[in-house]
């Protein structure tokens, strides 16, 4: 049996900013009350300027990443342009909806920058999707994260400010949610680049919150 199928628990955050988007997750994966991994990857690059966060079953999430990454590359080869974030979301929504009788146990955030500007979409396990215009959180620690996001988010926020807010939201969620913990992984996407922040720089920002 594939143990990845049973690795669960997470908190993810997505923030829409004026100049891009910020995606962030903690890195703990659990099997019941057991901490199965302290370095679980939960942010995946889907296209040049598109990322996806995953909450739920790691095995299901990795299957989705493999499929949608290939679909994105095929679209670019055929059309000579990148698929839009809305297009990726529609593909994922159809895939998840098609599995509704044997659902893939995931919550996803798709975020990035395309010709229409910065955008983030959230998807549930049955394929329902919502365009998020502000800040969003998924996973077991999301109630705690939302408390910070709702209090501190502003519509004129830049990605620099968004990074600080995402780290603060996850830092607080990890204090109360046993399925969330360890390090924080942060990705910043602007019209120019997809960048994963240095873990040491993220840790220094967390130390200022203690």
Curated annotation (Swiss-Prot):
- By its UniProt entry, which PANTHER family does this protein fall under? ATP-DEPENDENT PROTEASE SUBUNIT HSLV, METALLOPROTEASE TLDD
**Activation and inhibition:** The formation of the proteasomal ATPase PAN-20S proteasome complex, via the docking of the C-termini of PAN into the intersubunit pockets in the alpha-rings, triggers opening of the gate for substrate entry. Interconversion between the open-gate and close-gate conformations leads to a dynamic regulation of the 20S proteasome proteolysis activity.
Q: What does this protein do?
A: Component of the proteasome core, a large protease complex with broad specificity involved in protein degradation.
What GO terms in the biological process aspect are recorded for it? Answer: proteasomal protein catabolic process
> Subcellular location, in the record's words?
Cytoplasm
**SUBUNIT field:** The 20S proteasome core is composed of 14 alpha and 14 beta subunits that assemble into four stacked heptameric rings, resulting in a barrel-shaped structure. The two inner rings, each composed of seven catalytic beta subunits, are sandwiched by two outer rings, each composed of seven alpha subunits. The catalytic chamber with the active sites is on the inside of the barrel. Has a gated structure, the ends of the cylinder being occluded by the N-termini of the alpha-subunits. Is capped at one or both ends by the proteasome regulatory ATPase, PAN.
The organism is Methanococcoides burtonii (strain DSM 6242 / NBRC 107633 / OCM 468 / ACE-M)
Q: Per its UniProt entry, which superkingdom is the organism in?
A: Archaea
Reactions accelerated catalytically: Cleavage of peptide bonds with very broad specificity
**UniProt name for this protein:** Proteasome subunit beta
State a GO cellular component annotated for this protein. cytoplasm
User: Which Pfam families does the record cross-reference, listed alphabetically?
Assistant: Proteasome
- Annotated active site residues, numbered on this chain, are 10
Keywords of the record: Autocatalytic cleavage, Cytoplasm, Hydrolase, Protease, Proteasome, Threonine protease, Zymogen
Q: Which InterPro entries match?
A: Ntn_hydrolases_N (IPR029055), Pept_T1A_Psome_bsu_arc (IPR019983), Pept_T1A_subB (IPR000243), Proteasome_bsu_CS (IPR016050), Proteasome_sua/b (IPR001353), Proteasome_suB-type (IPR023333)
Q: What is the lineage of its organism?
A: Archaea, Methanobacteriati, Methanobacteriota, Stenosarchaea group, Methanomicrobia
């Amino acid at each position: 049996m594939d143990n990845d199928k049973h690795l669960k628990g997470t908190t993810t955050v997505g923030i829409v900013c004026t100049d891009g988007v910020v995606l962030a997750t903690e890195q703990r994966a659990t099997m019941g009350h057991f901490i199965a991994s302290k370095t679980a990857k939960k942010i995946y690059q889907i296209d040049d300027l598109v990322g996806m966060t995953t909450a739920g079953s790691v095995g299901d999430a990795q299957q989705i990443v493999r499929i949608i990454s290939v679909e994105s590359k095929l679209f670019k080869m055929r059309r000579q342009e990148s698929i839009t974030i809305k297009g990726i979301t529609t593909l994922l929504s159809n895939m998840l909806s098609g599995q509704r009788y044997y659902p893939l146990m995931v919550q996803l955030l798709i975020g990035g920058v395309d010709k229409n500007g910065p955008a983030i979409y959230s998807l549930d396990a049955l394929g329902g999707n919502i365009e998020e215009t502000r800040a969003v959180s998924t996973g077991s620690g999301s109630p705690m994260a939302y408390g910070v996001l709702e209090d501190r988010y502003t519509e004129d926020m830049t990605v620099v400010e968004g990074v600080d807010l995402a780290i603060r939201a996850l830092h607080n969620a990890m204090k109360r949610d046993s399925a969330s913990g360890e390090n924080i992984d942060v990705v910043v996407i602007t019209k120019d680049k997809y960048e994963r922040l240095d873990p040491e720089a993220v840790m220094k920002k967390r130390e200022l919150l203690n």
